[in-house]
Amino acid sequence: MAFPAFAEEPEQPITGSCGEKLTWTYYQSTKTLTIDGNGNMPNYPADKYEGSIAPWRNNSNIDNFLEKVVISHGVTSIGENAFFWCDKITSVTIPSSEKSIGMGAFYSCKALTGITIPNGVESIGEDAFSNCDGITSISIPGSVINIGYGAFSSCGGLTNVTVSEGVKNIDEYAFYYCSQLEDITLPDSVTHIGVNAFFQTPIYNYDSEWNVLYIGNHFIAANQNISGEYTVQSGTKTIADSAFSACGNLTDITIPDSVVSIGNHAFDSCGLKSINIPKSVTNIGECAFYTCFDLKSINVNTDNPAYCSEDGILYDKEKTEIIRFPQEKTDTSFAIPDSVTSIGNDAFLYCSGLKSIIIPDGVEKICDNTFFDCSALTSITIPNSVLIIGENAFERCRESMKVNYIGSTEDWGEVIGDGKNVLTNANIIFCCGISAKHSEGGKNILVKVINIADGKNVILALYDGDRLVEVQQSGEYSENSREITFTPSKAYTNAKVMIWESLGSLSPVCNVKKLK
């Protein structure tokens, strides 16, 4: 007897959503997960104890078997930890619509044998492909701006990396401990290489046999035994983070005009006595000259568009930020220029010879570690324009230090905040002074009188270059009029605001405020 044939029922996939406009579909027969839709995938925690992990990772029928991932065109980001430790995935398809690959997205996908990153991806996140031992070769397209911290670290099978022209930043540890990586191509477009980006790869295996290490036109590292003078190769584009770190016997360095970037901590703990910055350098990283205890001067080419120097001190081009006061500079006192509005991180760190510093009115921020371990500092003048004092800005300074504060006790209470113990215990002297600024429209000049008794005269002197063009007098002010507004009747290039005991006095009673 014959039995009728029945059609096989189609497989019912497992489905769900992963974002407002994205859906996912998993077919058990092919072990394939497809993500469709338009927009960004959400970020997920790596561990379920930290929150809701990616839905396919939360389903043992998928997580234990998933081999193939297809991301359809329209998806614009792969979320953080989306396929974290999916160690059976062998293939991933990424569309050209993709802009970013999130942190840990394919972390420890050990069976993944290859990956094509399409042109259009702009960012590869921290640890995105870390510990993917099956990947043997990777090409980074020029659309990628940033290769994140540890992005391909510990990829034990990786032998070849090609970074295309256009890529700008390679973060710390990006290819760390890729134990078979010997073939590396870097373009001239790269302007930053983080510390240990290629450390523990075969190019470091014989560090005792080389003095310096380059990859293409990028200076990666110097052997700490290097001594005396060294000239960076002509054509070099970047000096990587910590490239000369701990080269204590390096006393002189020549940087060619081709270099555009000096990395973070690039010359940390070197024996340099002076350094010349060429006009080509447009980026100097944080702490580039950290603990250079013999450094007396930093000299910048006058044609440099990003930086300048005066008397061996490093500033930004407009002299609005003081970046580094050399640690071995012999000055015992220093008045920061009136143009400065910000004092950078570590700007005076370990300047143990300085005893007195005057900060001008107009400075708004003293950054982290600015005066750290200025152990001889006994006096500092701080105006009430300062709104922020960073962490450890005065750490390891003398607790008996005298602080001349041009402002009120209320102002001081607001700026000092919590945790700035040295300044909390310092000898605070509330000084007289004036502050002045242009009104929002730019024509009027607003003057504020600070800690000065009633009955004094406020004088405004206007100049065209060095030529005095106009003088205005406020008349005597009282407690009820501590702010005065001047309206100049003539054009001027700079101005001075002064307070006098009387018009017959020979000198002002406090600081003279200059304005442009």
Model-derived features with residue positions:
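Solvent-exposed serine/threonine-rich low-complexity stretches and specific carbohydrate-binding patches
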Residues: 469-479, 512-514
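Edge beta-strands of extracellular beta-sandwich domains
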Residues: 503-516
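Short proline/glycine- and polar residue-rich coil/turn motifs
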Residues: 120, 166, 475-482
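Structural signature of tandem-repeat unit edges
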Residues: 6, 32-40, 63-77, 87-100, ...
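Exposed aromatic-hydrophobic patches
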Residues: 446-449, 481-489
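Sec-dependent signal peptide cleavage junction
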Residues: 2-12
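Beta-strand signatures of extracellular beta-sandwich domains
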Residues: 457-462, 496-498
